[in-house]
Amino acid sequence: MIRFPLCFVIIAFALPVFATEDPTIRELSAEEVTDLMDGGTIRDIARGTPLRAEVIGLIEAPRDELSTILLDYPQIPEWAPATEDVEVVGTDDECTFIEGVTKIPWPISDRTWRMCSRGGDETIDGQEAFVYRFDHVEGTGNIDTSFGFWVLYSLPDHPEWTYVRYVVNADPGIAIPQAILRWVTNGALPDLISGLRARHGELY
């Protein structure tokens, strides 16, 4: 089952119990790098409970500028078209809590969520990277669970390009038709990369 959001986001004043998938960097072949520099994306969906979806792209922009866009939570709908009404509702020592709505095509009703979000620089697979994690706050919204991450790092051989990987594991609490999975694969996932790229162009 699923939910995206971009992706993300998070809220509530409960002590969050974080789900797990450790952020990693997927190695790219030379052919994949060329395709991604031309605007392509790598996308994957794995059925299960939760459903797992991911997208990888390359953006010609500094990592720090892109990470700033990711952490500007109220502005997420400006570049993530499936996400609406994002609001910061609190913070604690570990998280910024945000809530929002993921717009899903008919016949699925929109998904609402609260999440715990945190981001910062880490070393991932030997690379200095920015990592943004998000986890659904149990018992909030109308989804069962959602958790995942973004990883951003500068390509060693092409430092002007930033590798962007988004992974989400999600169970929206309802069965997901095949048509919705196609929408995720062909629309929602690549839209995150193109939207982030366009938002950077607007701001910088």
Which positions does each model-derived feature cover?
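Hydrophobic/aromatic beta-strand elements that line small-molecule binding cavities or substrate pockets
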Residues: V55-G57, V86-E87, T102, T112-D121, ...
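Beta-strand/loop substructures that line and gate deep hydrophobic ligand-binding cavities in soluble
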Residues: D135-G187
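Hydrophobic ligand-binding cavity/cleft-lining segments
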Residues: A19-D93, D191
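Positively charged n-region of N-terminal signal peptides that target proteins for export
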Residues: M1-F4
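Long, compositionally biased interface segments
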Residues: I176-Y204
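Cleavable N-terminal signal peptides
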Residues: L6-C7, V17
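A short, structured loop/turn motif at beta-sheet edges
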Residues: E60-R63, V89-E94, G119-A129, Y153-Y163
